[in-house]
Amino acid sequence: MSKVSGANETLQGALAPLSHMGGGGDATLLKDEGQVELPRGPGVLNVQVLPEEGHAHLQDLEGYKSMDPRQSESASTDVSEMLQHTASLDDPIQFTRVSTSSVTSNSSSDPRESGDTQETGSRRGCSTEEQAPAGAERVSGQDQDSWDVEEVVAEPRSGIDVTPVGDVTNSTIRASGRSAESTSHYLDEYSDTRYSSSSPSSGSRKLSTTIITPEKNVVAQALHCYADNYESPLNDLMSSGDERSSSVRETSFENASSDTNANLNGGRASTGESMRSPPPATGLPNGFVHTQASAPALPVLPAKSPFRAVQSPFSGTRKSRNSANLAELSLPRTSTSSASSMEQRKSRGGRMKVVLSSFVQNIRRNSQGEKRRSGTAMKISTPYNATHVHHVGVDSRTGEYTGLPEEWERLLASSGISKKEQQQHPQAVMDIVKFYQDVTGTSGEDKVFKTFNVSSTNACELSSSPSFKTPSLSSITRFEGSHEAYNSAYHSPMLQSPMGFHDPQHDEKFIPSRPAPRPPGGAAPKTDFTSPLAYDSQSATATPKNQRFSNQSSGFFSLARKATLNKNKQQLPPIPSAAAASAPITQPGSTANIPYIKPAENPVSAPSKSIPPSLPAVPTPPPPIEKDPPLRDLEREREREHSSAKQGQLALERKREEKRRRNQKLQAKLAEICSPGDPSKIYRNLVKIGQGASGGVYTAYEIGTNASVAIKQMNLEKQPKKELIINEILVMKGSRHNNIVNFIDSYLLKGDLWVIMEYMEGGSLTDVVTHCILTEGQIAAVSRETLRGLHFLHSKGVIHRDIKSDNILLSMDGNIKLTDFGFCAQINETNLKRTTMVGTPYWMAPEVVSRKEYGPKVDIWSLGIMIIEMIEGEPPYLNETPLRALYLIATNGTPKLKDADSLSPVLKRFLSWCLQVSPNDRATAMELLYDKFIVEVAEANASLAPLVKLARMKKLAEKMDADSDDNRTD
């Protein structure tokens, strides 16, 4: 509701004080409601507060036109008569829309039910103190002071905007673009609004409202009076006005005449705010001015424009058509509240919330639109580099394996493991499959399954001690550390560990097993024994590590045992490795190629492969419009191939660079380990007695002492795992023992490594067990010396992991020493168990085959198998295929002897203690050294000397027989 405040002045001849009315006043006002034609322009007038008890009806005022829609008759007196002496201004008055629909809907359409009678008394008591005197002088156009027009502006609390469309009574005031909700909220917010009436005895009715002055006592008195009388009944009638200054609400007064516009001329108080000219309001027959003030009154200055501009919430098309005839009211702006700053902050906070909410919604809408656009444009190509992963399982109903690759099925079929055995021990077969997967799962050089006798060279071709053999591709491994001396000087990542050895599981391979004799009718190639100084590159051809060498000085002929002769009849099963495609596997002792099975492609094991095996098939759609997507797919595929090729090339270059740096570090470390000089000037009479995968083995005599030594020459370029060599050298350097082959010295000459070791001219134990029969005393002697060497290694935390007859060397006087430490590994307190797959499968312990943790007792199991080898001439399951041998080791546990009744109980007890399936029940090296079989039955080492000589003569006889056969064939 609006109120008009004049400085002790009233409107001339038109306005009179409102008379106090009782309840009957409401009925008088209601009867004429509905006959008034409200303007359709945007304006606000709160009509609820007019028909109050004790106040004069507005319809009785002269020149006042009621805003009630039910008012049928207009007032008799025109406002133009009231303002006939006032000067006209050129600037139009700013109008806002007036809506009464929200007022009448929320309060009451019937004044009798509106509850106005409850507010009349309190209003009457408060307003009489502030009303203008009845006999005040009338205002002339020249002497008129400023009129303060306040506007009650409704701000919806619930955020619901009441549209004025279609409602002829909708004339709620809207300021700053806000919609009105209900009149019930107006007076609650504007608690400083006062309505008063003059004495009813006055001749003419006057509209007197609260005088707004900058004096603090008047404002405080008015607020106090209103708080006592109006705060309670008007709690719900609040609204916010202008957001920038809400301390003083200014109202606009509408002229009742639609064709006569009165202009009020007055001064405007400067408030420190920039004054803006209001835009012309159109669409209203009468003008409203909406101004505000938020600062105390200051001295009046000449005003260029008497109105402060208020932006209309309506578009320009809805402005009043009569704006040209509107006059402008000059209104002073004053401040009546000290709480304006707080309300300003609240208003600014609300505005900021609206801005931020709109900003967030726009961002969300844009992001959703981008997602929809990107989702429609995205296309998924067909898979490339696809691989099929096999999951091997066992059918519980049929007992058959499911998910086996085709090559594995053929491997099992050729391994000799029957269906019945597979059904009886499915888990064991699964372990064997995993075993093969682990062995063949590596890539590159390590993906060569040369575990067993897969050589095209005759077993009788060369003769040498196994200690002179270099590790081949099949005997490649890493170790989790090195010796203490090596660990303190060298810090290669591949050789670091708590104890120095680095031993990743996936690099472990089988050690070659016993070779088979040459096939019938096959001629063994002749061997030329030359000095290493005249050694050329052709002499470094790859020869398997399992070659048995005979001494050149042997001139006796002998025949191999029958059991060993049968080994040439068996062929290895096809091996599912990638190397099989490029290097066909040959039968031991023959040159015939064995068909291989092409393994399933595994891109994980070959990351350098950049081009997919095949491009996805491009369909040929009949419509021409569908040709573009396949072309785009092909283009993308080509781009992927190109990028993959680049990535693969970069990866290959990085790998080569890393390998080069690693080789440089290994070369530097070898240079530190090796002694400077030329071994050809220190040793004389070098004679080649054997050939390894990466070099040859020679015998020589030291100049000055005439001591016989063995020289192991290795071409480092052909040695794929140089850390193995370093490991073996360091282990031998730190293992000075009577039962360990002693390391003498090493040299690095022109890229070749020369290792000088103690020479065991008697050869290996393999020559003895294959050509001679040992007694229990001799078996006990060999076991004793082996146990002493193992006890020494185990005390150092070293596991040999490859105890077999090939790695037991004898001298001519019968002394026994361990050799071939290329596969040894160290353990410590933090790593007491190992899980790597290493060693020769026929001598493997069950825990190794089953991929369980193991410790030093795996060497004790291998010793037990070696004892069976000394008893029967070969290890158990040697005539079986390797896969079936592993299966039998895992399922049978302790192997059975062919003629156990011929053995003494002491030997059987000792053997049973070594071959316990459970490592916890298996004996240690120290316990076995105190066993009765070792203490009482073992003979002296000299008892082995005749066997060594006999084995050498038989081996030489076999070689001479082979040479004669070759001559007859030629």
From Swiss-Prot:
Enzyme Commission no: 2.7.11.1
InterPro entries for this protein: CRIB_dom (IPR000095), CRIB_dom_sf (IPR036936), Kinase-like_dom_sf (IPR011009), PAK3-like (IPR051931), PAK_BD (IPR033923), Prot_kinase_dom (IPR000719), Protein_kinase_ATP_BS (IPR017441), Ser/Thr_kinase_AS (IPR008271)
Chain ranges of the Protein kinase domain: 683-934
GO cellular component: cytoplasm; incipient cellular bud site; mating projection tip; nucleus
Region of interest: Disordered: 1-42, 86-185, 236-284, 311-351, 499-551, 592-663
Comp. bias regions, Pro residues: 613-624
Biased composition (Low complexity): 98-109
GO biological process: bipolar cellular bud site selection; budding cell apical bud growth; cellular response to hydrogen peroxide; cellular response to starvation; intracellular signal transduction; invasive growth in response to glucose limitation; negative regulation of gene expression; negative regulation of sterol import
Keywords carried by this UniProt record: ATP-binding, Cytoplasm, Kinase, Nucleotide-binding, Nucleus, Pheromone response, Serine/threonine-protein kinase, Transferase
Compartments, record wording: Cytoplasm; Nucleus
Region forming the signal peptide: none
Catalytic activity: L-seryl-[protein] + ATP = O-phospho-L-seryl-[protein] + ADP + H(+); L-threonyl-[protein] + ATP = O-phospho-L-threonyl-[protein] + ADP + H(+)
Keyword Isomerase: no
Biased composition (Polar residues): 1-11, 168-185, 248-264, 312-325, 536-551
Domain of life: Eukaryota
GO molecular-function term, one example from the UniProt record: protein serine kinase activity
Active site residues according to the UniProt entry: 802 (proton acceptor)
Domain spans labelled CRIB: 380-393
Compositionally biased residues, Basic and acidic residues: 625-644
Record-listed ATP binding positions: 689-697, 712
Family: Belongs to the protein kinase superfamily. STE Ser/Thr protein kinase family. STE20 subfamily.
The protein's role, per its UniProt record: MAP4K component of the MAPK pathway required for the mating pheromone response and the regulation of cell polarity and cell cycle. Phosphorylates histone H2B to form H2BS10ph.
This protein's name: Serine/threonine-protein kinase STE20
